[in-house]
Amino acid sequence: MKKIIISFLCFIMFLACEVPEYDFNEFYDADPPALVFQPFLKKVVAGSVNRVDLEALEINGTAGMYIKMEYDPDFVAIKEVVAGEFFASTNQPMAIVEDQGTYIEIYIVYLSDGISQSATGSGVVVEVAFESLKAGKSQLNISDQSKVVDANNEGLVMNTFGYFIIDAR
């Protein structure tokens, strides 16, 4: 009888438990080809300067990008944007960054090494340094107005444009 009661109580406890649902919307959950942030969430100290990578995920034949990255200027100040290794060949990529107040525009172009005219694969496109101005949550978003082109200036289809959550305390 004791075994039956214990089994019954265990069964009731099993039914009463809820299975937690987690949001694992990270780099490898993106549907490639994609432009995503790595990591997608960062806890920071308010007033500090931090960095995040904007990465290409399985993009083939890329010769250039226009990236529109939106942010809230009440919470975030963009300090610096530096080209990553994705477009690097024997020549460093050409990157132009324009801050428009609520978004930045990043133009980055692959400079041919005489052998290939484009970059392929995954890697850091740019590293973004930002200052969290005050406590609270904010985001950096890659707008769907962003474009990726091949060597013939033909648009490449992107399946995912990522976001980055800043949790400043």
Task: List each model region and its residues.
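Acidic, low-complexity intrinsically disordered segments
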Residues: 17-169
